[in-house]
């Protein structure tokens, strides 16, 4: 009846100190992650009511919601922590002592902020499992950390590092015109993948009064000129994102039909009529850099919402409140992307400030929802589930460190998340996810940015790669010398 799932621990499973992985470790891990772990775990394992020791090698998980068909898989993926290692330690404290683990690699040495070296565990207990055959082929893997992206690229070109996945379009287009690349000694490869690419966007904090009117949020999207940005800053490499589940069959498209339409019609009096009449499309331009028509539309929407321009300044109807907000960043590379957007906003009379802070301050502010707008995103998979509560549910809107960055509070969205979690078939999952996608898009909680359906990788010609690239893309875990 799906109210429980039982697992038997493999007899050969052991920690790196030689002690066996036990049922006690499993139970302790669940309770610790829910109580002291990242808030994500409280949502993810929220329907796991208990873990019970059945025998020395068997554990039973009981579920409070038997309609969540994914729960057995979710608990099957749970990180298992060594109880005996943590018994005399405070799990909530930061430490530089490498924790005990049980995987194919362990930490060999490290220097905080500079590098970490992993060494292969020769007697790794799972080495002969079918899932691991052909993987974990390197004796040592060193991961270097850099503060400056330019220095990383120079380190790669000089041979100090062996592999990099490039994340900047400008660098991919201009920074690797070298003899090593031309001669094929340094491989520069664009590998197609079929992973859902999720949503990267300018994210409104709707907890702020200034962003609580969806007409305002919709208006500001007309100031972002993706076509100009893609042409002039990204060398035409990106595709505009039109869904929170982009690059997958979960993305909403055209108008709702079939089961999706049936689901949405239940909420016909509670959701925008446009969902049934107009497919979502982000504003587009001619890429010439002066989106006059779009800014006119934005101005009209702002006027509908009670904002008008007086002396080149956008104010409310009483002329007492200025429209001003801050875009919070931590990446220097994003400033050149955000500044043209900010210039267009200023043409609407909006006083927008672009502020870049260090990563630690940025993380703390985001965790406490202390921002007006950020650039952020949500990953996606082919099987969305419990994690969607953390992204969009009303209960997550005020949960510190949750991923509901936009502050979404909508009872219909809450119900649609429950619908996709409880889906009994792929058809139901797709229909509920597409319906959720439409609600999120129609709410204008974000200004969608762009995505890439390939991996831009560079590596020195010393590696062997599988002849067939997995649909999910390549991974150095599958490579060899």
Predicted regions and their residues:
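A structural "hinge/loop" feature
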Residues: 1, 19, 41, 66, ...
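Aromatic- and charge-enriched surface segment that lines or borders ligand/interaction sites
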Residues: 1-39, 54, 60-62, 146, ...
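Short, well-ordered beta-strand elements
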Residues: 4-7, 26-30, 59-61, 103-106, ...
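Ligand-site clamp/hinge motif
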Residues: 6, 10, 93-96, 124-177, ...
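Surface-exposed binding/hinge segments that line
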Residues: 8, 14, 42-86, 104-111, ...
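Extracellular/periplasmic solute-recognition and catalytic clefts
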Residues: 50-53, 108-119, 144-208, 215, ...
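Gly/Pro-rich hinge or "lid" segments in bacterial periplasmic/extracellular proteins
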Residues: 75-135, 139-140, 147-151, 158, ...
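Detector for C-terminal structural segments
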Residues: 111-116, 223-282, 295-299, 332-343, ...
């Amino acid at each position: 009846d799906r109210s429980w799932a039982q697992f038997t621990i493999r007899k050969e499973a052991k920690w790196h100190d030689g002690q066996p992985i036990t049922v006690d470790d499993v139970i302790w891990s669940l309770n610790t992650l829910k109580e002291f772990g990242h808030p994500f775990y409280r949502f993810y394992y929220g329907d796991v009511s208990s873990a019970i020791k059945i025998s020395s090698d068997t554990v039973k998980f009981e579920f409070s919601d038997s309609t969540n068909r994914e729960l057995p898989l979710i608990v099957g993926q749970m990180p298992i922590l060594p109880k005996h290692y943590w018994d005399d330690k405070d799990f909530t404290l930061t430490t530089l002592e490498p924790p005990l683990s049980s995987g194919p690699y362990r930490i060999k040495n490290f220097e905080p902020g500079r590098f970490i070296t992993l060494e292969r565990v020769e007697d790794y207990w799972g080495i002969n499992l079918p899932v691991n055959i052909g993987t974990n082929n390197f004796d040592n893997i060193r991961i270097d950390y850099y503060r400056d992206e330019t220095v990383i690229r120079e380190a790669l070109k000089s041979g100090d590092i062996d592999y990099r996945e490039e994340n900047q379009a400008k660098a991919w287009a201009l920074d690797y015109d070298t003899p090593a690349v031309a001669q094929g000694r340094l491989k520069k490869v664009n590998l197609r993948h079929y992973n859902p690419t999720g949503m990267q966007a300018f994210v409104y904090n709707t907890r702020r009064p200034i962003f609580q009117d969806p007409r305002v949020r919709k208006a500001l999207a007309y100031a972002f000129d993706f076509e100009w940005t893609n042409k002039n800053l990204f060398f035409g490499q990106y595709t505009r994102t039109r869904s929170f589940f982009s690059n997958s069959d979960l993305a909403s498209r055209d108008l709702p039909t079939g089961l999706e339409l049936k689901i949405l019609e239940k909420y016909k009096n509670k959701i925008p009529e446009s969902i049934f009449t107009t497919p979502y499309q982000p504003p587009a331009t001619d890429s010439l850099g002066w989106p006059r028509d779009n800014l006119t539309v934005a101005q009209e929407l702002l006027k509908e919402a009670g904002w008008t321009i007086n002396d080149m300044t956008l104010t409310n109807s009483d002329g007492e409140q200025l429209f001003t907000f801050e875009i919070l960043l931590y990446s220097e590379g994003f400033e050149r992307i955000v500044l043209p957007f900010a210039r267009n906003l200023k043409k609407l009379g909006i006083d927008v400030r672009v502020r870049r802070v260090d990563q630690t301050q940025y993380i703390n502010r985001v965790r406490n929802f202390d921002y007006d707008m950020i650039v952020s995103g949500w990953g996606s998979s082919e099987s969305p589930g419990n994690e969607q509560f953390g992204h969009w549910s009303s209960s997550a809107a005020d949960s510190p460190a949750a991923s509901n960055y936009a502050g979404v509070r909508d009872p219909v969205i809450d119900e649609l998340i429950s619908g996709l979690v409880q889906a009994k078939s792929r058809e139901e999952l797709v229909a509920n996810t597409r319906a959720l996608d439409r609600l999120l898009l129609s709410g204008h909680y974000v200004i969608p940015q762009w995505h890439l359906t390939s991996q831009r990788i560079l590596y020195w010609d010393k590696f062997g790669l599988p002849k067939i690239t997995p649909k999910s893309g390549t991974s150095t875990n599958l490579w060899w010398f």
